[in-house]
UniProtKB/Swiss-Prot annotation:
InterPro entries cross-referenced by the UniProt entry: Nitrogenase_MoFe_mat_NifZ
Species per Swiss-Prot/TrEMBL record: Azotobacter vinelandii
Family, as annotated: Belongs to the NifZ family.
Name listed for the protein in its UniProt record: Protein NifZ
Gene Ontology terms describing biological process: nitrogen fixation
Taxonomic superkingdom: Bacteria
This protein's UniProt keywords: Nitrogen fixation
Gene behind the chain: nifZ
């Protein structure tokens, strides 16, 4: 088991990292670092003899956390930041249809269930729950943050 990253390498988080109970002074489940943050590999160790754990220092945040190898890429690797995160409330900026049947009307509220970044040619996509058990895979450009009544009215004004 050889490490993919070496001491001093600049790396980027590709997943949000939450406290698993081992980070002092913060509640379990608290967000430690957002995806996209860049840090420097400070140390490499193992967990349960089969997982490489990198101690990464994030200078801008002044925080050092343990990261699994699959949570990191080189900072120099291509990266597109995503606009939304898990549980963010969003609105559809256009009607969404499957096989010609409109399932979601423009302006309908939804909630982000998952961020999908595995297919770069498709861009950032999301699993969005629109209520009544309806979950659709939606491209980022078809969504807007539902952070205020003004944002919702702005989308609906275009109808």
């Amino acid at each position: 088991m050889l490490p993919q990253f070496e001491y001093g390498d600049e790396v980027r988080l590709i997943r949000n990292v939450r406290n698993d109970g081992t980070y002092p002074g913060m509640n379990t489940g608290a967000l430690l670092m957002r995806r996209g943050a860049v840090g420097c590999v400070y140390d490499v160790g193992t967990y349960l003899q089969d997982q490489l754990i990198y101690r990464v220092h994030f200078l801008d945040e002044g925080r050092t956390i343990g990261c699994r190898e699959e949570e990191l890429i080189l900072a120099s690797a291509p990266w597109i930041p995503n606009l939304f995160e898990f549980r963010d409330d969003v609105i559809a900026t256009r009607s969404l249809a499957v096989r010609g049947q409109v399932l979601v009307k423009r302006g309908q509220l939804g909630s982000i269930m998952k961020v999908l970044r595995d297919e770069p040619e498709l861009g950032i996509q999301y699993h969005v729950h629109f209520g009544d058990g309806l979950v659709l895979q939606v491209p980022e450009q078809s969504l807007a943050m539902a952070d205020s009544t003004a944002a919702i009215e702005e989308v609906l004004d275009g109808i």
